[in-house]
Amino acid sequence: MRKNATMIISSAENASTLATTNLAANLADVRNRIAKARSSNELQLPALVAVSKRQPHDRIEAALAAGQRIFGENRVQEAQVRWASRRGLYPELELRLIGPLQTNKVVDAVELFDVIEVVDRPKLASSLSSEMARQGRHLPCYVQVNTGEEHQKSGIWPEKADEFIAFCRDKCSLDIVGLMCIP
């Protein structure tokens, strides 16, 4: 798996009105914008992650039909229902966990997802490490950083990030490939 910069292109006001029939055209537009970003940045290649939480079946099918293969999910249980039957149909599918992860859901998360973007505390890092070893999987992980330093949001505060990343890499042997920042 190559290391990519994640580019999230979103517009809240357009998201609710975007018709399924326009999805392919919108994906093509976003892919053109990513291609422009690629041409100006040789070190990292942006990847388009389609956030599929709460999306109806027909929208996900339209995205898949239009060639989208990287999806972000917020909840483990919803992702299991949504993607279990599709995994066999789309072997190149990449699922990313982008929502909070409770330690009691780690077994299922490691089994289902290809990337974990929400490593935010030592207990979770240790649990992920143990479960990945048990399942024989070594998933790329992102450390979640709470850049806004807001107590109601998850994530490591910026001044603790270096120490936590070292813990994840050195003590837990996690493959930390980047940061997922929450403003």
Spans of features found by a protein language model:
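Conserved alpha/beta-domain cores
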Residues: 2-183
